[in-house]
Amino acid sequence: MGAIVLDLRPGLGVGPFTLGMPICEAFAQIEQQPKIYDVVHVKYYDEEPLKLDIVISFPDHGFHLRFDPWSQRLRLIEIFDIKRLQMRYATSLIGGPSTLATFVAVYALFGPTYPGTYDKDRGVYTLFYPGLSFAFPIPSQYSDCCHDGEAELPLEFPDGTTPVTCRVSIYDSSAGKKVGVGSLMDKASAPPLPTGSIYMEEVHAKLGEELFFTVGGQHIPFGASPQDVWSELGRPCGIHQKQVAMIDFEMGYAVFTLVDQMVIHSASDPRPRTTLCADYFYNYFTRGLDILFDGQTHKVKKFVLHTNYPGHADFNSYIKCNFVILVGGSFPDVNNYKNRITPSTKWEQVKEILGDCGRAAIQTQGSTSNPFGSTFVYGYQNAAFERIANDDLCNSQVMKNGYIAT
C-alpha cells in the first residue's frame, strides 16, 4: 500500500486521531476504515500493564499512537518512518516517498523557531514548534555544526546537504513541555479533560449499599428499579439477558464457562433443557459498568465494574471504570475509610485488605479462540474479583447479601 495522506494538526493530532481521545475511540476510527488501517499492532507490557504505554502501531504507515496506561487516553503520536506517511499542513504536503521532510523543507513550511537541542550521545538534533517536534540524525563528521548544543538555522552541512527527519512527535503543548526522542518522549501527557467530563470519573462503591458517581452526583442503590437507573444514568448502551455458566470441575477448581441461551439435549434424557435466565443486564459501555437486575423483582442486584486492561477478552468493549471500592469506614464520608480497592490494586493487596478467600473459580469466557486464556474469579461476601494471569484486576463485581455468582 502506498503512503496515505493525513492532516497534521500540531498540538492536536493527525488525521482522525486526536490527542486525549480514549483508546476505545481510536479503535472505533480504525474499524471505520479497514482498507486503510489493515495492519494494526497493539503493544503493551503484559506483566505490568500500568508501567508502560499501550501502543497502537501502524507499521505500513510508519506511525504509532501512545496511550497513557492508567487513563487510556492518547498522549503522544509518533511518526517513525516519514517516508511511509504523507502529512498535509494547510495547503502543503510533507513526507511520503515523493516529498522529503528535510530540515530546510520543515523550516520553510513551519517557519522560524528557537534553536533546538542536540543530543550528542544519540547524534540527534530536535527542532521544536508548539505541540510538534522534528528529530534529525546528525552524522558524526558534522557534529561540530551544533555548537554548544545549538546550530544555525536552517541547518545545512558543509557539503550542501541537509538532514532528513527521522521522527516526528505530536503532543499537547498546553503545559509548555518540549517532547522529542529518548527521555523527552516521557514528558508528553494527555491534555486536560474538559470541565464536567465524566471520563475517568471516580465511582465510589460501598459494599452491600450503593454506587456513587462523584462528578454527576448520582446514587444507584441496590434495589433500584430500571426506571431509577434510567433517570440517573440515562438510556443504557445495551440490554442483555444474563448468560448462564456451565460448571465443571478440573484439578479441584470450579471452571465456569459462559454460554449463550440455548437448548441442551442429553443422551439419557431426550427432552430439551434450556439455559434461560430471567436476570438481565443494563450495559453502560461508556462508563465501564454493567448493572444486573433480578428478572423477577426487577431490582438491582449486582454491579460489574470493568478495568478495560489489555490481556482480557473484554478489552476495548468498555471504557475504563475508575472505581473506588470503600472498605472499613462510614459512608458517605469517604475519608473515613481505612482501605480502598481501585483498578490499580493488585490481587495480593486485595487479599491483604479483605483476607484470603480460598481457591479461585476459573472462567473460560466460553471461547476456545480467546487468545488471552482463562481468568480467575474470587468471591467474598458482597463482592467478587476477576483477575488475569499477571495479578491485575480485570473487573470487580459488587453485590448485596451474596457471594460469588456468575
Q: What kind of region is each of these model predictions?
A:
Residues 1-406:
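Short helix/turn-capping signatures at newly exposed starts of structured segments
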